[in-house]
Design a protein with these regions (language model features):
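N-terminal segments that mediate ammonia production and transfer
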Residues: 1-133
């Protein structure tokens, strides 16, 4: 992993189990869920909702989570760094009903819109959204 550079969240399946890991800066999200007896990984919480899984937690920046026989082990192979999550997770990549870093994507988008309206008010009759873009 120390040879990898850039933003990533990885999920690997081996003969022994699953491995989920996130880049040391936490640019890309990765979450852990439980579906019946299985531990699952996803890039956003809404994927857990779609399959009926229960959200357990987010994988921390630089953390590697190993799942064997239904048990999770956490390894932190990197020195702790100041996280730098990508703002595009909130404004573009994630679905509005997802939770990223403990915050509702919808609420972040709404707050950004309110800030934009306060900074640059315009005379308008209607706002046209671009759903799920």
């Amino acid at each position: 992993l120390k040879q990898l550079e850039g933003a990533y969240s990885l999920i690997c399946m081996t003969a022994e189990g699953l491995i989920g890991c996130r880049d040391p800066l936490g640019v890309r999200p990765l979450v852990i869920g439980r579906l019946n007896e299985a531990i699952i990984f996803a890039s956003e919480t809404v994927a857990l909702d779609v399959v009926g899984a229960e959200f357990i937690r987010s994988v921390d920046p630089g953390e590697m989570v190993i799942v064997r026989d239904g048990e999770m082990t956490s390894i932190r192979p990197f020195a702790e760094q100041n996280p730098r999550p990508c703002i595009f997770e909130y404004v573009y990549f994630s679905r509005p009903d997802s939770i990223v870093e403990g915050t509702s994507v919808y609420s972040v988008r709404k707050a950004i819109g309110a800030e934009l309206a306060a900074e640059n008010p315009v005379q308008a009759d209607i706002v046209i959204p671009v759903p799920d873009s």
